[in-house]
Amino acid sequence: MNKFFYSIDNNNNNISFKNHTLIWPSLTLGNIGQLTIDVLICSFEFKRIGFIVDENITPIIGNDCFTTLDNNNGIMSTSIEVYQSSLFPSITLVQQRSPIVDGRIPNFSENLFKWINAEEIKEILFLSSSNANKRVDSQLTGSQVRFIKSDNVDKNIISKLNEMNISEMELTVQSPEGETIQLSNRLTGLAKEIYSTINSKNNDNNNKVSFLCLNLFCSEGYNTNEALQMSNLIYNFIKNQESPSSPQLKTPSCWKLLQGPTFDQSLFF
């Protein structure tokens, strides 16, 4: 396959993804996944190690999303960036800032899956969101996060999710007449394509990759609180024995412009 990942220093030999969990944001309602990745990068010393470059991704370039007044390095942001941290040696974060070209999701998914296998990545974890208005009765109370998994997910992961009070996405519901109604698993776009690919290859002995998606029910709006909630959940999911019990979450400087400038409060006094 064509080169897919480019390291910062053009030397891929110093970077390993073997047995990593790759955390990827879905471009879904409220941008919960992308905002969550922002928080994780800022809070846990994740450093940019490279970029994913593919003809199926809309190219963009912009200002550094994580610049502070005392650390203005003038680093540019690009379409898809890859991050790792010494605090979580088996975790790789991906930040996707631009969409896949219309109609090219299957092509990008194929290239991504080949790269994941070539790098011996253990698991891909999507962070997703879906419309709270479309919940069924059993989803109205309790945790608003559900998981969707491939058939080959490790049982220990399922046990950990259950301990965190995260249930599997409901796929059926009973109608008042007693009929069973099939429900969507809420996957869309790239997550849906990768999920289908991994499940179709379960009988392939060469496929060692598992799929997991954490989906948060939400409404469109100012979704930073939901992103912080999801960040806390992800921390508890990936933390190790040396990690503090409670995370100190930080938000990036670029969040100051999420909703534009604030109003002049003196207008009302």
Swiss-Prot record:
GO cellular component: cytosol; nucleus
PANTHER family found in the cross-reference section: PROTEASOME ASSEMBLY CHAPERONE 2 (PTHR12970:SF1)
UniProt similarity note: Belongs to the PSMG2 family.
Compartments reported by the entry: Nucleus
GO biological process, one term: proteasome assembly
Keywords, sorted A to Z: Chaperone, Nucleus
Main location: nucleus
The gene coding this protein: psmG2
Presence of keyword Metal-binding: no
Name this protein carries in UniProt: Proteasome assembly chaperone 2
Function summary: Chaperone protein which promotes assembly of the 20S proteasome as part of a heterodimer with psmg1.
Organism name: Dictyostelium discoideum
Subunit structure comment from the entry: Forms a heterodimer with psmg1.
